[in-house]
Amino acid sequence: LRDYVNKSGFDGVVLGLSGGIDSALSLAIAVDALGPQRVQAVMMPYHYTADISKQDAAEQAKMLGVHYEIMPIEPMVEAFMGTLAESFAGTERDTTEENLQSRCRGVLLMAISNKKGLMVLTTGNKSEMAVGYATLYGDMVGGFNAIKDVYKTWVYRLARWRNTQSPAIPERVIERPPSAELAPDQQDSDSLPDYDVLDAILLSYIEGDMSAEAIIAGGFDAEDVYKVVKLVDRCEYKRRQAPIGVRVTPRGFGRDR
């Protein structure tokens, strides 16, 4: 990360700090690599952002000594929805409105990047990137992703290990159920199998090069396996547009090193 940021001519990095585990680990990595003076974290809350997410983000930013700002996105989202109201008339609310939130955050981070000469770090893990649990031109906007080849279950292990070296991530961030917080009471498990199951399937399919049938024969639920395999295959177009990052597995996506 430090080598790439320096060679690319950026003064430092900026990332969205959501109060979740992925951005928390990414922030810790950025500070370890660059020092707190070269890292900016931005909390961009909306209606669905939990109070504890705001508290945890602020606590971690203070813990690591980085520049921290809060930029609510309600005015941006409402402006977009007002512009789109006629076009969306007669349609039901769906992931379109959720993605607007993510894309508003991407716009803010890129504006900070342009103004301050900071590279935007994205924070999606390999489990999310594999199944497309990310928003194109939203939380995928950026120049580098330190954890793009790290499965979600590994993210937790890395976070716990990092805290054994020195406190860097609030314990509550590690213990809370993961959520994108783009809808009321949303949890990742609403859309995906539990990460223990998801990662086991992904490891078999991607790293193990196993067929869906072979994975099912290993004892996994057929519906889960076929859903995951379909998502992995369908979402290649998203992964092709993701920023580069560090490769840590034999089957990293893209041509990262």
Task: Report the location of each language-model feature.
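ATP/NTP-dependent adenylation/nucleotidyl-transfer catalytic domains that generate, transfer
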Residues: 1-18, 23-257
